[in-house]
């Protein structure tokens, strides 16, 4: 059975999510929206925003994969080292 997150951990995780969301929104807005003469979102702004979001998601996924690979390598190295230390000479 999966362990439940405490309420404080859930709040912390949600705050981190909101911080990330707000930063992403601000960065993409500043990069993509240049014309404030109309209330409508222009096609170029929409396309730019979509590309900005896609790029961020791909970057996040790639970083996560690299982070997992790094931890697997570290665990394998520790296991190999422990195996060598545990063997009689």
From Swiss-Prot:
Keyword Mitochondrion: yes
GO molecular function, one term: metal ion binding
Gene Ontology CC: mitochondrial inner membrane
The organism's place on the tree of life at top rank: Eukaryota
Location of the protein in the cell: Mitochondrion inner membrane
UniProt main location, coarse: mitochondrion
InterPro entries: Mito_inner_translocase_sub, Tim10-like, Tim10-like_dom_sf
Membrane topology term: Peripheral membrane protein
Annotated keywords: Chaperone, Disulfide bond, Membrane, Metal-binding, Mitochondrion, Mitochondrion inner membrane, Protein transport, Translocation, Transport, Zinc
GO biological process: protein transport
Record keyword Ribosomal protein present: no
Cysteines joined through disulfide linkages: 28-52, 32-48
UniProt motif Twin CX3C motif: location: 28-52
Family membership noted in the UniProt record: Belongs to the small Tim family.
Domain statement: The twin CX3C motif contains 4 conserved Cys residues that form 2 disulfide bonds in the mitochondrial intermembrane space. However, during the transit of TIMM9 from cytoplasm into mitochondrion, the Cys residues probably coordinate zinc, thereby preventing folding and allowing its transfer across mitochondrial outer membrane.
UniProt subunit comment: Heterohexamer; composed of 3 copies of TIMM9 and 3 copies of TIMM10/TIM10A, named soluble 70 kDa complex. The complex forms a 6-bladed alpha-propeller structure and associates with the TIMM22 component of the TIM22 complex. Interacts with multi-pass transmembrane proteins in transit.
Purpose of the protein: Mitochondrial intermembrane chaperone that participates in the import and insertion of multi-pass transmembrane proteins into the mitochondrial inner membrane. May also be required for the transfer of beta-barrel precursors from the TOM complex to the sorting and assembly machinery (SAM complex) of the outer membrane. Acts as a chaperone-like protein that protects the hydrophobic precursors from aggregation and guide them through the mitochondrial intermembrane space.
Name of this chain's protein: Mitochondrial import inner membrane translocase subunit Tim9
């Amino acid at each position: 059975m999966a362990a439940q997150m405490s309420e404080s951990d859930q709040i912390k995780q949600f705050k981190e999510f909101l911080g990330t969301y707000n930063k992403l929104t601000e960065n993409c807005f500043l990069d993509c929206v240049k014309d404030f003469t109309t209330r409508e979102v222009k096609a170029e702004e929409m396309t730019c925003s979509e590309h900005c979001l896609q790029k961020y998601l791909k970057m996040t996924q790639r970083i996560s994969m690299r982070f997992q690979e790094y931890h697997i390598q570290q665990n394998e190295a520790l296991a190999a080292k422990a195996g060598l230390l545990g063997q009689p000479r």
